[in-house]
Amino acid sequence: MSTVTHPDTELHVHLEGSLEPELLCRLDPALTLAEARAFYEFGDFAGFIEGFKNAVRRLQQPEHYRLAATALFDSLAAQGVVYAEVIFSAGVVLWKGQDLDEVWAALREAAAEAPLRVRWNADVIRRFGAEPAEQVAAWAVRRASEGIVSFGIGGDETSCPAAEFTRAVAIAREAGLKFTPHAGETSTAENIREMVELGADRIGHGIRAVNDPELLALLRDRAIPLEVCPTSNVRTGAVPSLAAHPLRALYDAGVTVTLNSDDPAIFQCTLATEFAAARALGFDDRELAAIAENARRCAFDYGFQRAR
């Protein structure tokens, strides 16, 4: 394995969380830069959700999505990222009454011109419930040949039981899509276990697994990776400080961990800052290289893996 620690693979980055304040103002000329920056000033998870919503509200037409995607891709490429799996809130597009196919066409246009390889995770909001999740899963299956590799569930983990999404997950997985839910970010380890039982291929965040030795062993033995986002966890209050982050304990337990930026504009972070955070937690070059390699190995685009 290379000892180079430069990360080049991003597996957990939200399109809607990548809108810099300057871009928000471009999308909404009535918005001042000070107002846009204030959206991203918060101290807890509820405040983060409000900031995310304020960004989403500015995405009013397909062209806005194309501009957002292009800006994200250019930023990732400038960091040296060559492959990204981008989460976009397809469920929110439907909730806003927008034409999902038109938005998707704009995103595909941006991806076709991107200076890196892009694949997509079609995400739904947990509190919206089962029916829209099933609609998105069926839509994602129809678009799988166009770059969608996974189906995800995000949002408030306590808002709707995991079992409600059994059919949506089955629709996606039976057609060959992977399942990448958020779990164990702000709730309990039990939520991770429920998503594993639903068939999760990777877990977004998953840091609460550290509280359950049996779950740690399950994740390790089934080789289910965690998409860990340290800066995000600190900013949302999921952990009280970087020093208290369980990344080291997860890694030492043999769980496959990757590092990711999550919502880079909202949290003002990059993939590189997440590796710097890991170094601050005591990870050395060899361990950082292993984590970078985990992301490449856990990418859902197997053609990308073979090309490495």
Ranges and model annotations:
Residues 179-181:
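Conserved hydrophobic beta-strand within the GNAT/NAT acetyltransferase core sheet
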